[in-house]
Amino acid sequence: MPLDPDSSPAPPHRDWFFPPAPPFLPSSRARTPRAPFPSTSRSSNPYSFPDRRPPPTPRSRSRSPLPPPEQQKQQQPPPTTPPPAPRRRDPRYAGVRRGDVRTLTAEKAAAAAAVPTAAQVHGSKSAASATTLRWSGMVSVAAIVLCFSSLVRSNSSLHDQVHHLKAQLAEATTKLQSCITESSMDMSSILSYQSNNSTSQNRGLKNFSLLLSLSTLYAPLLILKYMDLFLKLRSSQDSEEEVPINKRLAYRVDIFLSLQPYAKPLVLLVATLLLIGLGGLALYGVNDDSLLDCLWLSWTFVADSGNHANAEGFGPKLVSVSISIGGMLVFAMMLGLVTDSISEKFDSLRKGRSEVIEQSHTLVLGWSDKLGSLLNQIAIANESLGGGTIVVMAEKDKEEMEADIAKMEFDLKGTAIICRSGSPLILADLKKVSVSKARAIVVLAEEGNADQSDARALRTVLSLTGVKEGLRGHIVVELSDLDNEVLVKLVGGDLVETVVAHDVIGRLMIQCARQPGLAQIWEDILGFENCEFYIKRWPQLDGMQFEDVLISFPDAIPCGIKVASYGGKIILNPDDFYVLQEGDEVLVIAEDDDTYAPAPLPKVMRGYLPKDFVVPKSPERILFCGWRRDMEDMIMVLDAFLAPGSELWMFNDVPEMDRERKLIDGGLDFSRLENITLVHREGNAVIRRHLESLPLESFDSILILADESVEDSAIQADSRSLATLLLIRDIQAKRLPFREAMVSHVTRGSFCEGSWIGEMQQASDKSVIISEILDPRTKNLLSVSKISDYVLSNELVSMALAMVAEDRQINDVLEELFAEQGNEMQIRPADLYLREDEELNFFEVMLRGRQRKEIVIGYRLVDAERAIINPPDKVSRRRWSAKDVFVVITEKE
């Protein structure tokens, strides 16, 4: 069969994979292969790769490489059958063979293997393309700036030419209309020529000014934008990454604005000057005015954005609008700076950060529940001076302190209270409140743990003594523990006066338990509302005996002498025959320091005592409800005061073994107790059945202590004390004999007959209850209800602090009156000094008291509710009753 490719058509089974040729493709003759395709039998398992032999790769137009001839010979199987006749091939698929599938797969694998190499090439070229783009951007920005500059320059040139033509036209018109001589016309033409020459000379300067302003404006922006690019090009690729110049510049600006106090106003001033200067240069480039006029015009555009409305021409209008926009930004910045400055100033004033410029003021350091009473007492003391200044510094917000003080609602009486926020441990804060110029510094104890509070007070004293300017006034320190007093005085030296609040309340409770009524007397003496202690020198009294000095003051009561020869020591209740020497001062009880003065001796009758006897002491039974930190000190003081055979019952929830251990650790020696016997009872003071186990009706005095071992806050301790008080009074009222008869005799008043409060008031006739109240508000509540005989609170401590702050010498007097040795304040019956219905004036009663080595300072009538200290009219005679009582200062027995 002849192999004619044109005569025989392509067999249909050869085109089973390829689609028919499109009609528009031209037909071409296929190339004749050099060797015919081998005839192979189809395997029964076409997917069995080990038995499958690939056909030899024919020569085609494919780019895949052909194996060498030796390999082709090895791969070609021996012919088993004669080769078939060559068939006509489709010209559309010339060069494509069925055996090329593996070759195509190899080509795809090679192409896939070549892909990572192309990606690497592309990545290596990305940096170069980015650099090219950045340079292209730089060139574009520079071209835009140059185009804009050329447009502005062309516009200004056209504008100048128009003006020049108008000027020439006006000149020509003038020449035609006027009839002037030829010489004058020649002169005007010469002047016009000179002006044209000067205009052409100034035009170059104006163009330079315009370009200078634009370049100055855009050059920093371009430098900042492309500075990092320059640095990256100069640095090597292996070097460490550096911080961009933009970030470094922003950091430097931030540091400058943060550290320099005047940085923001300085930046605003520089920005304003740059805007005026660049705007003036730009206006000079587009206007015919002089440079000074353009600078002034630029300032007017900055100051008032509406001034650019009169500009003519495109160039002047564009520059004017730009300057006005910059001026608005500058004034917005200035407004923001002014607003921030005013806000910071008001915020500083609101938070109490400003300095106090005061002198001879009272400085209070710290914050506690005693602050209200302290401020009230100091304000009353300053009333005679026309008011004063009190500065309070604590670690609280100023507004919060002012709000708390406003809630106290007491009359300041002309005294100004200034609050500042700060720490007394920081010298800068102490200088802020003018600590060196204060006449007195009061350090309040913190609420909470006593040792921590005293430790902080000690650090505060160290800070105060470290002030370089020195202290003009003295330091009054409130301590919580008596054991820490020695350490604080050791650190502070002569500048420090201490008031141990816990010890003061404990000793007052013991005195009031022995002599009911002393609490009210101490409130009158310690407070500035009535009479208090004053020390003053009176030269006219030198050479006079103390017995005569005693009756020399119609409006005061002398109590002691400050002896100059003893180094200023104060002697309470001196001997009658002591003669005042030069430099001695007199201690008196008076209403104020300017309300008393010595007067001539009055005429008095010196009588004799009705009987000379010593008031016998009888054994007493006292109950302590609760536990205090200084219980051992109270026991020792009570043992010194009571008669032999007395009993002290201790009722609290502290186990008995723990009580003995705490008392021994506190320094109590049980073997040294001579007059009292301790009786321990364990129980809860707010549980009724526990209280009913006690013989409450047999106690002479009951002391309800603020149980600090159970409660932490003052309000919780007061609530517990109030509950104990009500339970004890109710149990006593139900145990009294003839309760119904006694209740029926209750005086009609605030409470109706048979009420439980009336029963409690009747029960108070049998025993006295002394309640320790920490919060003054609770004290006022109990005082109004009258269910407790006497209430002692922190208000007494505040009074003592205020008195010592006004005069530090009074602290020695108070310490002696509170101590178990020396002189004390007592209440005596009237029959010790006079007879029934005897008429005497107060001076004569005072002289009767001197026969017992006592100083009578006041009295309380039988039908009166309160005692009168320092009676106003001491020369008026009156009839006394044997049931009246006198308040005296006498030596402890």
From Swiss-Prot:
Report if keyword Ion transport is assigned. yes
Q: Where in the cell is it found?
A: Nucleus membrane
Chain intervals for the UniProt region annotation (Disordered): 1-94
Q: Which UniProt keywords apply?
A: Coiled coil, Ion channel, Ion transport, Membrane, Nucleus, Transmembrane, Transmembrane helix, Transport
**What InterPro entries is this protein classified in?**
CASTOR/POLLUX/SYM8-like (IPR044849), CASTOR/POLLUX/SYM8_dom (IPR010420), RCK_N (IPR003148)
The further comment given in this record reads:
Can restore mycorrhizal and rhizobial symbiosis in a Ljcastor mutant of Lotus japonicus.
Query: A GO biological process this protein is involved in?
Result: monoatomic ion transmembrane transport
Coarsely, its chief localization is nucleus
Q: What happens when the gene is disrupted?
A: Defective in mycorrhizal symbiosis.
- Give the bilayer topology: Multi-pass membrane protein
**The organism's lineage?**
Eukaryota, Viridiplantae, Streptophyta, Embryophyta, Tracheophyta
Query: What are the annotated GO cellular component locations?
Result: nuclear membrane
Q: Which residues form a coiled coil?
A: 156-178, 389-415
Q: Where are the transmembrane segments?
A: 132-152, 210-230, 266-286, 318-338
Tissue localization of expression: Expressed in roots, leaves, stems and panicles.
Q: Where is the signal peptide?
A: none
Q: Which residues form the RCK N-terminal domain?
A: 359-500, 619-792
Biological function: Required for mycorrhizal symbiosis.
According to the record, what induces this protein's expression? Not induced by mycorrhizal colonization.
Composition bias (Pro residues) maps to 65-85
The entry sums up its family as follows: Belongs to the castor/pollux (TC 1.A.1.23) family.
Which protein are we looking at? Probable ion channel CASTOR
The protein's superkingdom reads Eukaryota
